[in-house]
Amino acid sequence: MKLSFLSLAFAVIFVMAIMYAPQVEAKASADADADADAAASADALAKASAGMLDRILGAVKGFMGS
């Protein structure tokens, strides 16, 4: 059976997303600054996700040869 390039690309993206996934640790916070901590955590997560997506897309472009 022939494997299409689209499914191969999805498989590569899936594997790279697992490889580059950051290790995270959850912590509970019950103090008054919990909302500020949550906003800072959300900003840090957004920046990390954008960087991870850039690396994955760069790797896929390199793999596809474009």
Curated annotation (Swiss-Prot):
Any single Pfam family the record assigns to this protein:
Pilosulin
Q: Name one GO cellular component term.
A: extracellular region
Keywords, A to Z? Neurotoxin, Secreted, Signal, Toxin
Under Gene Ontology molecular function, one entry of this record is: toxin activity
Q: Which domain of life does the UniProt lineage start with?
A: Eukaryota
Q: Does the keyword Secreted apply?
A: yes
Q: Report the leader peptide range.
A: 1-26
Q: Propeptide-annotated positions?
A: 27-50
Q: Where in the cell is it found?
A: Secreted
Q: In which tissues is it expressed?
A: Expressed by the venom gland.
- Annotated InterPro entries: Pilosulin
Functional summary from the UniProt entry: In vivo, this neurotoxin paralyzes about 50% of blowflies (L.caesar) one hour after intrathoracic injection, when tested at high doses (54 nmol/g).
Family as reported in the entry's similarity comment: Belongs to the formicidae venom precursor-01 superfamily.
What is this protein identified as? U8-myrmicitoxin-Tb1a
Source lineage: Eukaryota, Metazoa, Ecdysozoa, Arthropoda, Hexapoda
